[in-house]
C-alpha cells in the first residue's frame, strides 16, 4: 500500500508539473501572440484611378473698345506738368473697373518716334502728330491692342510708322491696320484675344481666342472693294471686327458715303463695325442684324471746347463660346497661343487644320466716358444718357439678330 501510494503521489506531481508547464507555455504564447500579431487586419490596398484631365467647355472675352487715344500736344504738356508724368492721362482709368474686362482695344491716334519733341503750336499748325514713346508702358497697363489705321500714324513717314510698330511690340501691345488702305496685306491681322476659359472641373483659367481685326483708314482715300473683301477670308474661320477711321469730322451722323462704306464691311464678313475719326459720338444702326457704330468719339484727347468732343462711347463687347465641341474648342485655344505677334500665320494654320468656326454669340453695351477737365473718367448719369440718346442705342439693340444681342 505504501509503495502504491508513493507511486500515486509521483504521478500526481508529474501531472501538476506538466499542467503548470503547459500553462506557462500557453501564457507565453498568448503574450507573444498579443505582442507580435497585429491588433487590426491590414487594410486592403486601393489603387487610385487616374483622374480625368479637365478640358475646356466654354470661353468668354469681356472686351472694351474705345475711341481715339492721343497723348501728344496739350495732353503731353498737362502730363509733364503733373507729378504723375506719363501716367497722368491714364490716372482715372481704374474707375472703369479694368479688372472686370479681359481686354481693352483703342485707336492710337499718333506715331511714337523717340527724340522728336513737337510743341502744341507746331502740331496744331501742321496737324502732324507725334507722341512720346514714354507713354507706351503706361498705355500697356490698360490696353492690349490698338489699331493704327488712321490719318496720323504715318505723320512721321514710313520710318516713323515702323518705329511705332517696334515700340508697341517692345511694350507687349498687339496692333493691326495701316494708314494706307492700299496696303491690302496689312489691313487685317489675327489677334490673340484674352479670354476666360471655363473647364470641365469647374475652374476658370486664362486663354486666348483667335479673332480677326481689320483697320480701315478712309479719310484721305476710301478703301477699295478689294481691300474690304479681305475680311471674307477671315470670316470663314473666326469672328471679324472692323475698326474704320473715316467720314466728316464734328458731325452727329454719318453721310451717305460713309454709311455705304461701313455697310459694305458687314456685307464682306465683318461681325460688327466700330468706327472713329469724327471726334464726336455719332449714331448707330442695326444693318442686317449687325451692329454698326459710326463713331465712338474721343477717349483720351486734348480737345476741351465742348461736350461733343469730351464725351465718348466705349463699346463693351462680350464674345461668348458655348456648346462647342470640346475637341474643336481645345484646338482653337491652342492656336490662340500663337496669335500674339504681328503678321502671324494663324489664319494659315486654321485653314491647314480645316478648323470649323466656333459658335460665337456677341453681346453689346455702352460705357460712357468723359475727358473734360483733362482726365478721362466714367461719364456721369446725365452724360451717359446723352450718349445713348445720340446713338439711338435702344432702337438699334432691338433690331439686332442672333447671334448678336444686347447686354
Feature roles, as predicted:
Residues 114-138, 238-270:
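Active-site-proximal segments of metal-dependent phosphoesterases and phosphodiesterases across multiple
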Residues 72-74, 112-115, 151-165, 182-188, ...:
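Active-site environment of divalent metal-dependent phosphoester hydrolases
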Residues 1-15:
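N-terminal Lys/Arg-rich, disordered targeting/topogenic segments
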Residues 65-67, 103-109, 143-151, 176-179, ...:
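Active-site neighborhood of phospho(di)ester-bond hydrolases with catalytic His/Asp-centered motifs
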Residues 142-145, 256-315, 321-325:
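Conserved beta-sheet core of the metallophosphoesterase superfamily
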Residues 76-91, 125-126, 190-243, 249, ...:
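Binuclear metal-dependent hydrolase catalytic cores centered on His/Asp/Glu-rich metal-binding motifs
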Residues 43-44, 48, 54-60, 253, ...:
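A short C-terminal boundary segment appended to hydrolase-like catalytic domains
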Residues 42-149, 153-157, 164:
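N-terminal catalytic scaffold of extracellular/periplasmic and nuclease hydrolases
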Amino acid at each position: 500500500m505504501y509503495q502504491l501510494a508513493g507511486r500515486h503521489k509521483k504521478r500526481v506531481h508529474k501531472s501538476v508539473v506538466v499542467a503548470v508547464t503547459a500553462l506557462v507555455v500557453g501564457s507565453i504564447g498568448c503574450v507573444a501572440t498579443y505582442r507580435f500579431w497585429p491588433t487590426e487586419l491590414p487594410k486592403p490596398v486601393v489603387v487610385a484611378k487616374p483622374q480625368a484631365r479637365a478640358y475646356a467647355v466654354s470661353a468668354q472675352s469681356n472686351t472694351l473698345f474705345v475711341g481715339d487715344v492721343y497723348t501728344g500736344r496739350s495732353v503731353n504738356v498737362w502730363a509733364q506738368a503733373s507729378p504723375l508724368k506719363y501716367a497722368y492721362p491714364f490716372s482715372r482709368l481704374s474707375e472703369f473697373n479694368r479688372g472686370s474686362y479681359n481686354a481693352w482695344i483703342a485707336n492710337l491716334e499718333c506715331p511714337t518716334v523717340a527724340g522728336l519733341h513737337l510743341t502744341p503750336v507746331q502740331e496744331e499748325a501742321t496737324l502732324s502728330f507725334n507722341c512720346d514713346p514714354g507713354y507706351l508702358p503706361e498705355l500697356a497697363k490698360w490696353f492690349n491692342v490698338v489699331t493704327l489705321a488712321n490719318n496720323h500714324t504715318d505723320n512721321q513717314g514710313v520710318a516713323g510708322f515702323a518705329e511705332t510698330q517696334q515700340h508697341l511690340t517692345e511694350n507687349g501691345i498687339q496692333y493691326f491696320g495701316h494708314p494706307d488702305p492700299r496696303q491690302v496685306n496689312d489691313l487685317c491681322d489675327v489677334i490673340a484675344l484674352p479670354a476666360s476659359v471655363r473647364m470641365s472641373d469647374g475652374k476658370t483659367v486664362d486663354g486666348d481666342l483667335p479673332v480677326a481685326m481689320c483697320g480701315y483708314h478712309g479719310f484721305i482715300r476710301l478703301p477699295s472693294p478689294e481691300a474690304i473683301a479681305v475680311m471674307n477670308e477671315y470670316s470663314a474661320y473666326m469672328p471679324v471686327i472692323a475698326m474704320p477711321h473715316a467720314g466728316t469730322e464734328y458731325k452727329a451722323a454719318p453721310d451717305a458715303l460713309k454709311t455705304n462704306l461701313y455697310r459694305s464691311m458687314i456685307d464682306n464678313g465683318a461681325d460688327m463695325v466700330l468706327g472713329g475719326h469724327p471726334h464726336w459720338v455719332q449714331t448707330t444702326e442695326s444693318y442686317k442684324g449687325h451692329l454698326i457704330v459710326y463713331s465712338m468719339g474721343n477717349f483720351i484727347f486734348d480737345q476741351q471746347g465742348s461736350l461733343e468732343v469730351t464725351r465718348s462711347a466705349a463699346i463693351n463687347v462680350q464674345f461668348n463660346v458655348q456648346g462647342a465641341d470640346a475637341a474643336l474648342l481645345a484646338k482653337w485655344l491652342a492656336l490662340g497661343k500663337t496669335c500674339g505677334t504681328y503678321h502671324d500665320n494663324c489664319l494659315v494654320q486654321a485653314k491647314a487644320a480645316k478648323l470649323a468656326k466656333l459658335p460665337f454669340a456677341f453681346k453689346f453695351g455702352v460705357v460712357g466716358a468723359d475727358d473734360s477737365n483733362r482726365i478721362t473718367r466714367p461719364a456721369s448719369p446725365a452724360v451717359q444718357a446723352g450718349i445713348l440718346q445720340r446713338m439711338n442705342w435702344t432702337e438699334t439693340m432691338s433690331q439686332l439678330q442672333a447671334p448678336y444681342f444686347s447686354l
